[in-house]
Amino acid sequence: MAKITGNLVATGLKFSIVTARFNDFINDKLLSGAVDTLVRHGAVESDIDTVWVPGAFEIPLVAKKMAESGKYDAVICLGTVIRGSTTHYDYVCNEVAKGIGAVALQTGVPIMFGVLTTESIEQAIERAGTKAGNKGAECALGAIEMVNVLKAL
């Protein structure tokens, strides 16, 4: 039985990171974690392009454009949606998740979902580099692994 796995070596790979500007005090930390992880695993900063969009809802469109460009081995999507007192949270979270998943399936490029969907600011802070780790860094690891898994197939 063959066991196909992806390694965590980013040498020679190119990445795009699409980050929402809304809640940027959290998203800056997610972005820093992602870039740091990519570099620690062999990517060079000149092979990492970052694009800022107004909010999480706009991420899938830009991720699709980046994936279709053929310039990137993977696209990492970062943002934070914090529940408020209206149903807006539910609509945004659902559409962003569907949109990012659709882009991956349509393009065949790994598109990583690093959009925090939290009940509170405290939960978001925990996931951006404190006691729950940095989800931007985790997405970067996932991107590296997925690129290498797809290359091994």
UniProtKB/Swiss-Prot annotation:
The active site is at residue 88. (2S)-2-hydroxy-3-oxobutyl phosphate binds at residues 85-86, 127. GO terms for cellular component: cytosol; riboflavin synthase complex. It is an enzyme of class 2 (transferase). Pathway: Cofactor biosynthesis; riboflavin biosynthesis; riboflavin from 2-hydroxy-3-oxobutyl phosphate and 5-amino-6-(D-ribitylamino)uracil: step 1/2. Keywords: Riboflavin biosynthesis, Transferase. This is 6,7-dimethyl-8-ribityllumazine synthase. It comes from Haemophilus ducreyi (strain 35000HP / ATCC 700724). The gene is ribH.
